[in-house]
A protein has these predicted regions:
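A cross-kingdom marker of C-terminal helix-rich interaction/assembly modules
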Residues: 1-238
Length: 238
């Protein structure tokens, strides 16, 4: 990663173009760091034949790539394709940046400040709201994240195999038959739901699923990260 991209999050709200640039730099380094770490976890899991760990990292890689793609193509591109932006459009762009970087569904301020009672009361309020079919947002959430399934579905409309890949890895990490297969093995006596009896079922699933994962993540992630980097206004740089 180019060191020029490594910028502390210290937005200058008086200059919206520089504010946008600061957000983009932080997003690029965050995406790069997460993708690199997930790949490391995936490779380490395969090395020690922990195929459930492989599937967990794989699903996160798909979700990360899908979210990046969604923001680049469906949020930034319609605005940045314009020759000039109005004041209102510039404000919208910065709001997109903020949601992209700081969106979430967990009250990190309460957690990091050790206000666990607030987390508890928010959880209780959320449960009560769900019973009455209402919605409750925790007090400390700055802006809500985009739903990752929205990102997956937007992509899958153009590339249906993405939904196949995502459904596969979701099934491999949920507590059901998919994840049970990853710790299963078989020999001449039959199928065992333990990893130590003959041929590993998880290894077979890994070999069969890896091409799906590679097609859905490596090149798409690199392409869309480059597009995100290109969203920086160079003429505003010192």
């Amino acid at each position: 990663m180019n060191e020029k991209m490594e910028s502390p999050w210290n937005p200058d709200v008086s200059d919206p173009r520089r504010l946008h640039n600061n957000y983009i730099r932080c997003l690029v380094t965050a995406y790069s760091g997460k993708f690199s770490e997930l790949l490391s976890v995936l490779l380490a899991s395969v090395k020690v034949r922990h195929f459930l760990g492989y599937a967990l990292a794989a699903r996160a890689l798909v979700e990360t790539t899908a979210t990046l793609r969604y923001y680049v193509l469906h949020q930034y591109k319609p605005l940045l394709d314009k020759e000039t932006l109005t004041i209102h459009e510039m404000k919208t762009l910065v709001e997109i940046d903020d949601r992209h970087l700081r969106g979430g569904r967990f009250d990190w301020d309460a957690f990091l400040s050790h206000r666990y009672e607030q987390l508890q009361s928010d959880a209780e309020a959320q449960l009560a709201a769900s019973k009455s079919k209402q919605r409750h947002a925790a007090q400390g959430i700055i802006t809500e994240q985009v739903n990752v399934l929205t990102c997956i579905e937007k992509w899958a409309k153009e590339t249906p195999s993405v939904m196949v890949t995502y459904s596969l890895f979701c099934d491999l990490v949920h507590p059901n038959i998919g994840s049970s297969f990853l710790v299963a093995s078989s020999d001449d006596s039959g199928l065992y739901f333990c990893p130590s009896k003959g041929q590993s079922v998880g290894e077979s699933i890994f070999a069969q699923s890896l091409p799906f994962l590679v097609a859905c993540t490596l090149k798409p992630f690199g392409d869309h990260l480059a597009m995100l980097m290109a969203a920086i206004w160079r003429d505003d740089e010192v």
